[in-house]
Amino acid sequence: MKLNSVLTLLFIALFTACKGGAYDLSGYGLKPDTGENASPLIAKALQEIAAEVNFDTVRILLPKGRYDFYPEGASKREYFISNHDQDNPKLVGLAFENMKNVIFDGQGSELVFHGRMLPVSLVGSENCTLKNFSIDFANPHISQVKVLENDTVGGLITYEVAPWVEYEIRDSNFVAKGEGWEHVPAWGIAFEGDTKRLVYTTSDISVGSKHVAEIASRKILAPWKNKKLIPGTVVVFRGYG
């Protein structure tokens, strides 16, 4: 009797997870707005779905809400990505591999990643659609600063670090920090503070991240010569990767 009950419950769970070519990820244990790590659950779900799909078109449905992804339990993949750092394996939040005729519908969900992760990969697949979700990082790998003063004669710029950026001044270097990562930014992109457009005739620029001093809370004085960075300019720092 117990065996029959277990088999019945298993059948119901499978039927709930997959119905008419649609896989509801809640049937794999994924629940929104809990703050819990969704990485191992979605890794297991996508692996199982890829192994058993037998419909012309498959829909994978993620109940609307916020999902947090952490490196622990995430899919590990070896990818070599153009214009990207080449450390491997990479930790992937949603790894879509060897899939065909798949529609992934996040139904308006917010996917928030923590640490150093690759949010989504789509490899060896065809005719796939990923839609209705947003991607963000709890602590982005870029650092935003605003130019306060620019001494073009002395080659010094004073800038203010955005309140959400984690950093420290270590050995006179501006060190951006996050969950499981840190770097001294090497390059940046400059935006006009009022219009948010790229500063005219600029692309990647070198940034003042070395030999700096913190002269007040979140205010940095740096040897940095660039006459185009007028006060109010917003610069987004990034590393090499």
Residues of each region from the PLM?
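Sec-dependent N-terminal signal peptides
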Residues: 5-14
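Extracellular beta-strand-rich solenoid/capping regions of secreted or surface-exposed proteins
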Residues: 43, 47-52, 68-103, 112-131, ...
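A structural signal for beta-strand register positions
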Residues: 66, 108-110, 134
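Non-catalytic, alpha-helical, charged scaffold/linker segments
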Residues: 145-207
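Long, low-complexity, polar/charged, intrinsically disordered or flexibly structured peripheral segments
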Residues: 186-241
